[in-house]
């Protein structure tokens, strides 16, 4: 059985992330979306909210599950008996950074990384940019799954 981890903070999960999850789910028997917690960063959404948003947005992917983790991605990968990571790439800048990470992960833990080129319609989308544009009054609804957009608007208006 081929299994892979898709790591990230997903704060919030975007349609670009969902695109990568769908494509990974089509290629691998099992996809684990690993929400990695950075104790230094205060996220917009807490861990439970992120898990719920990804679960709601990926119900159509029966071979995908969501987990939380801390520390090195490769430690999580190895602890699950897996050997691979999938990362989405938006631009050449992403590639340069992710290639270094992939080489380090292979060196320290023997973990392979598979890259998925982000669909062109999402090549500019990041969680950070979505938050920034929304905070400045821009409409980001076409960049988020519907259920995520609803929670996002509630959070932005202070009603959640």
UniProtKB/Swiss-Prot annotation:
InterPro entries: Cyt_trans-like, PPAT, Rossmann-like_a/b/a_fold
Reaction(s) this enzyme catalyzes, per UniProt: (R)-4'-phosphopantetheine + ATP + H(+) = 3'-dephospho-CoA + diphosphate
Enzyme Commission no: 2.7.7.3
SUPFAM superfamilies: Nucleotidylyl transferase
Positions bound to ATP: 9-10, 17, 88-90, 98, 122-128
GO MF annotation terms: ATP binding; pantetheine-phosphate adenylyltransferase activity
Cofactor(s) needed: Mg(2+)
Main localisation: cytoplasm
Annotated GO CC locations: cytoplasm
Gene3D superfamilies tied to this protein: HUPs (3.40.50.620)
Marked site: Transition state stabilizer: 17
Family matches, as CDD domains: PPAT
Pfam families according to UniProt: CTP_transf_like
Residues that coordinate or bind substrate: 9, 41, 73, 87
Enzyme class: transferase
Self-association and partners: Homohexamer.
PANTHER family (alphabetical): PHOSPHOPANTETHEINE ADENYLYLTRANSFERASE (PTHR21342:SF1)
Main function: Reversibly transfers an adenylyl group from ATP to 4'-phosphopantetheine, yielding dephospho-CoA (dPCoA) and pyrophosphate.
Identification of the protein by name: Phosphopantetheine adenylyltransferase
């Amino acid at each position: 059985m081929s299994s892979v981890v898709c790591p990230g903070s997903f704060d919030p999960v975007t349609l670009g992330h969902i695109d990568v999850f769908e494509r990974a789910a089509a290629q691998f028997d099992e996809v684990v979306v690993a929400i990695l917690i950075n104790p230094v960063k205060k996220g917009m959404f807490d861990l439970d909210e992120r898990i719920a948003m990804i679960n709601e947005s990926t119900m159509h992917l029966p071979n995908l599950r969501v987990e939380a983790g801390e520390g090195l991605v490769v430690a999580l990968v190895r602890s699950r008996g897996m050997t691979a990571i999938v990362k989405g790439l938006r631009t050449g800048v992403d590639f340069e950074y992710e290639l270094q990470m992939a080489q380090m992960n292979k060196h320290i833990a023997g973990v392979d990384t598979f890259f998925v080129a982000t669909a062109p319609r999402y090549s500019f989308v990041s969680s950070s940019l979505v938050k920034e544009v929304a905070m400045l009054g821009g409409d980001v609804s076409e960049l988020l799954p519907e259920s995520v957009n609803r929670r996002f608007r509630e959070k932005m208006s202070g009603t959640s």
